[in-house]
Regions:
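Sec-dependent N-terminal signal peptides
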Residues: 4-13
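Sec/Tat signal peptide C-region and signal peptidase I cleavage site
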Residues: 13-21
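Sequence context surrounding c-type heme c attachment/ligation sites in exported
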Residues: 23-151
Length: 151
């Protein structure tokens, strides 16, 4: 019932105000993923030897990723925010809204890999490398199906 009321309120808003609101949501969504990417980037650099392995730093980035998995993204995936709705602004494929269960599944694999990484990131470089590789596979797993190659 609450959902229906909310829809009615949204429908009453001027179209431009709503489009702006949705654009803000998309920006926030992309910001979330940028945070994932920023932390992952530091870890990958250590694995590749572009940065020196440091257990405490690796642990910090792994813990940041755990923190990010506790964020509920649901509101950032409001209807009307796919690449089909806002071309040029987002790479989120419309398939996401047709297959929330599939997205959820990819999300769960990602959360699991983050938690595993967090267990080992501070131990040594080999453990970090294995954890990062597994996690990277779960990022790619979702991107392959639900993120467009370009905007
Ligand atoms: C459950 C699905 C899913 C998982 C898991 C996932 N992503 Fe994404 N990611 C997306 C989607 C969808 C977008 C496109 C968002 C948009 O353009 O609105 C995206 C966008 C991005 C972007 C681009 C942000 C920008 O500048 O527009 C980066 C960077 C990124 N993801 C990194 C990661 C990393 C790193 C991981 C794993 C640690 C990860 N993602 C895991 C779905 C996922």
């Amino acid at each position: 019932m609450r959902k229906i009321v909310l829809t009615a309120v949204l429908a009453a808003l001027p179209a431009t105000a709503m489009a702006e609101g949705l654009e803000d949501l998309v920006e926030a969504r992309r910001g979330y993923y940028k945070l994932l990417g920023a932390n992952m980037g530091e870890l990958v650099a250590m694995v590749k030897g572009e940065a020196e392995y440091d257990g405490a730093t690796a642990q910090t980035h792994a813990a940041n990723l755990v923190t990010l998995t506790n964020y509920n993204l649901g509101h950032l995936y409001a209807p009307g925010t796919s690449k089909a709705d806002l071309p040029g602004e987002t790479r989120a494929l419309p398939e996401i809204w047709d297959d929330m269960a599939g997205v959820q599944e990819k999300g769960m694999a990602f959360v699991e890999a983050v938690n595993e990484l967090n267990e080992v990131a501070g131990l040594d470089k080999a453990e970090l490398a294995a954890g990062v590789q597994k996690l990277g596979g779960t990022c790619k797993g979702c991107h392959d199906d639900y993120r467009a190659k370009d905007f």
